[in-house]
């Protein structure tokens, strides 16, 4: 739900004037070292550090987020996940390039962003790079449950990756909604989407744990099918897709927010007289 003081732009919400997009899946075409599970929602690189390029099964709709969570890491490699969009049909790629950067990009009509542990934010026009690189904390879910990117509103709840409670003391931040995970950490959530512009082009945006990193690329062909690109590269070994709730939050999500309002931190949820499955849901486990 949008804040009471801010009117909702109905054209920016799914389910009001346009149908919600179908669930995201990985394409059957992928790098030689990738194995996709039968559900099409988990991609794992089984050897080496390369040949890990994956694609979305279908082209993305405007404003649709292709969101992945890092499930497994592998020590000994230098580099991390890469994320982006391509206007190339994955079915036409034989073989799939070894790397998204630079191999796939060099084929043209492809835009890929290398995720790093720090400094993923893109400087805005008229603002210094130092300001863009400065760490920031996004509004909490209870204050602003939507992430606004250009003309789109995206429910923030599932965009944010969270570590398991009890592992680190800093996870006791108020309401455990703050962005405490490094972008390349296990359980971090990263997404890509495109936003059409009036001139017929589109901007590509990268989302990291609920924060918009700004337009990572401009001038994309909005009229052409755009597929998501996920390069399970180097220290990133396995990712899974996360499905978003578009439009209004579900009753389940709203109930979780009500429970969280009365909690000091996640560990306090264990003391509630609730079924374990519900406690885990409230703790994002």
Swiss-Prot record:
What range(s) does the SOCS box domain occupy?
A: 250-285
Record-linked SUPFAM superfamilies = SOCS box-like
Name the segments for region: Disordered.
Answer: 1-20
Question: Tissue range of expression?
Answer: Expressed specifically in skeletal and cardiac muscles.
Cellular component GO terms held in the UniProt record: cytosol
UniProt KW Metal-binding keyword: no
Could you confirm whether the keyword Cytoplasm appears in this record?
A: yes
Q: Which GO terms describe its molecular function?
A: ubiquitin protein ligase activity
Localization, UniProt? Cytoplasm
| Chief localization | cytoplasm
InterPro entries the UniProt entry points to? B30.2/SPRY_sf, Neuralized, NHR_dom, SOCS_box, SOCS_box-like_dom_sf
Q: Pathway involvement? A: Protein modification; protein ubiquitination
Q: Which UniProt keywords apply?
A: Cytoplasm, Ubl conjugation pathway
Assembly information from the UniProt record: Probable component the ECS(NEURL2) E3 ubiquitin-protein ligase complex consisting of ELOB/Elongin B, ELOC/Elongin C, CUL5, RBX1 and NEURL2. Interacts with CTNNB1.
Domain comment (free text): The SOCS domain mediates the interaction with ELOB and ELOC, while the NHR domain may be involved in ubiquitination substrate binding.
What functional role does this protein have? Plays an important role in the process of myofiber differentiation and maturation. Probable substrate-recognition component of a SCF-like ECS (Elongin BC-CUL2/5-SOCS-box protein) E3 ubiquitin-protein ligase complex, which mediates the ubiquitination of proteins. Probably contributes to catalysis through recognition and positioning of the substrate and the ubiquitin-conjugating enzyme. During myogenesis, controls the ubiquitination and degradation of the specific pool of CTNNB1/beta-catenin located at the sarcolemma.
User: What's the protein name?
Assistant: Neuralized-like protein 2
Organism of origin: Homo sapiens
